[in-house]
């Protein structure tokens, strides 16, 4: 079975470390890289194979994960994107669906919900 390459886009160090540890629990996945700014994700997708992105909605320097996800889906529609947030606002979920995000994960959810 091929190893799935996962890019993590999260500006908070503790959350980024947690997401990395969740991915490392999955035997057929590996962390392909981490970024603190969503606007750098599109460029990173062009540099090498990525299967899945765990994308925080609000990242460093007010970089918008939803806007980045929308651009990535235009150029790399095969890449799956899971939007990640701690903000329980319906407008984020609505926009994530509209731009084609594949899933939505709340940071307060158990890690099994992410990896399971």
Identify the role of each PLM range.
Residues 10:
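Conserved acidic carboxylate
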Residues 13-33:
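Two-component/phosphorelay signaling modules centered on CheY-like receiver
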Residues 34-52, 60:
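Acidic, metal-coordinating helix/loop segments flanking the phosphotransfer/catalytic sites
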Residues 43, 66-78, 98:
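Short amphipathic alpha-helix used as the core "switch/output" element in two-component signaling
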Residues 54-69:
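Conserved phosphotransfer microenvironments
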Residues 91, 109-116:
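C-terminal output helix
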């Amino acid at each position: 079975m091929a190893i799935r390459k996962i890019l993590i886009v999260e500006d908070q160090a503790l959350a980024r470390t947690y997401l990395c540890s969740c991915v490392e629990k999955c035997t057929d996945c590996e962390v392909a890289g981490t970024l603190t700014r969503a606007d750098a994700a599109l460029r990173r997708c062009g540099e090498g194979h990525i299967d899945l992105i765990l994308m925080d909605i609000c990242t460093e320097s007010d970089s918008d994960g939803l806007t980045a996800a929308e651009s990535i889906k235009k150029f790399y529609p095969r890449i799956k994107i899971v939007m990640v947030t701690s903000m329980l606002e319906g407008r984020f979920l609505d926009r994530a669906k509209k731009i084609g995000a594949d899933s939505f994960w709340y940071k307060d959810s158990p890690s099994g919900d992410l990896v399971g």
